[in-house]
Structures are given as structure tokens and as C-alpha cells.
Design a protein with these regions (language model features):
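Cytosolic, membrane-interface loops and tails of multi-pass inner-membrane proteins
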Residues: 32-39
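Extended, low-polarity transmembrane helix blocks
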Residues: 1-27, 37, 45-53, 57-129
């Protein structure tokens, strides 16, 4: 498989978690906003709308290749505070630490993949560079 198709496959695989995560939040908007407020997120409903735009919109941009570099960079930057706030394994009870550390490290790996995507060669299969 040449690198052009590897980049396409990588983008498609990265997009799935964001699209499905965003779509999964839609029917539970008020519950998710309440959970976000409980984590100390100000204007949780507004923050959730932004989250949905980033997850669904950015995920679709990754999937289709439309401005994929920009989408990958925006999602990566957004994931930093999300990871620190929602997967703070150092501040949870011992019974939750392992699961939260795995999610924290998973997010770091996803951020790494997004940064690679953002810096990928313009030879990638995409609708717009």
C-alpha cells in the first residue's frame, strides 16, 4: 500500500471515533451538558455545542479529506483540555485510576495521530489540501 492510501486509511480510522462520539451525545444532550457542568465546565451547553461541532464536523472533515489538516489540528488542540479534565487519573479514586489512565494514554495516542495527519504530505488523497 503506498503512503497516499495509508494516509487516507489513517484519516478514515481517526474520523470514526469523533463522528460516533458526537452522534452519541446528541440524544443525551442535557445529560452530557449536566456531566460537563459537574466537571466544572462553564456554560456547559455552549461548550457541548462546540464539542459537537468539533467532533461531528471535524470528524466528517477528516473522513472526506476536506481541509483535513486544519480539522486534525483543531481536534488535537481541543483534545488537550478534554483529556486533562475528563481523564485526570491522578485525581480519581484508586478503583478508577487504571481506566482513566488508559483513556488518558489513548487520547495522547489519538492526539499523536492527529498531529501526524495535520503535518502529512500533500500527496494524501483528499478533496482539498
Amino acid at each position: 500500500m503506498n503512503s497516499k492510501w495509508q494516509l487516507l486509511l489513517g484519516r478514515v480510522l481517526l474520523s470514526v471515533i469523533f463522528i460516533l462520539s458526537g452522534l452519541g451525545k446528541l440524544p443525551h444532550f442535557h445529560d452530557v451538558a449536566g456531566m460537563m457542568a459537574g466537571k466544572g465546565i462553564p456554560l456547559a451547553s455552549v461548550a457541548l455545542v462546540i464539542t459537537l461541532l468539533i467532533e461531528i464536523g471535524g470528524g466528517l472533515m477528516l473522513l472526506t479529506g476536506y481541509k483535513a489538516r486544519y480539522a486534525a489540528l483543531v481536534i488535537a488542540v481541543w483534545m488537550v483540555p478534554v483529556t486533562l479534565v475528563f481523564h485526570n487519573f491522578w485525581a480519581v479514586p484508586a478503583a478508577q485510576q487504571q481506566d482513566q489512565m488508559i483513556n488518558f494514554l489513548k487520547n495522547l495516542a489519538i492526539i499523536g495521530g492527529l498531529l501526524v495527519t495535520a503535518s502529512a504530505s500533500s500527496a494524501a488523497v483528499t478533496s482539498k489540501k
